[in-house]
């Protein structure tokens, strides 16, 4: 049981990992050995050769965007457009109650959702031995780089809050494939606030003005260290909860 929990989610993680590390059949190079996520987090690995390095040790060309990242980027941009149209149609329906906007919103939802499924299927295809461009190194590069990015942000957020509170504690309650859950109770206690509406507004402002810019900065630090093609990790505040209960892994 935890009071005042805030979650942060990475946006479309696997598609963005493919774009960030330039993961594609024609960009893959020979990899480095004896690489672990812990060694990468502590920056024990030499990454000065200029090639993009994924967390499993696989290396990629970074002088030109690969075929797969290019396709992913195109589909992602299209999904963003249709998702925006969906939200606009939903707002118009809420304002006018005109059924044509309801139908339009549903249409755009289906289009953007199909593109979301298509984007996420890229990882599954790469990891399928019957796929023409199957390569277990590519699939592993995606999953392990995802682990690296989550564990990296766990470490950096703990550093941030320990510095803020002058402590040596662990403020990450839990993490998932693309998200982290932070214990904000000490911050709420510091403010002395008791009104829940005011607390939520204050936490929202703090996350937007302090935490999200910090996350962007430390993800750029990791991207520079790994020589990525493009820094694509975007993490935004998702949930603000006055209480959170964890009964088991992935059960909360």
Spans of model-derived segments:
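Conserved acidic
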Residues: 1-252
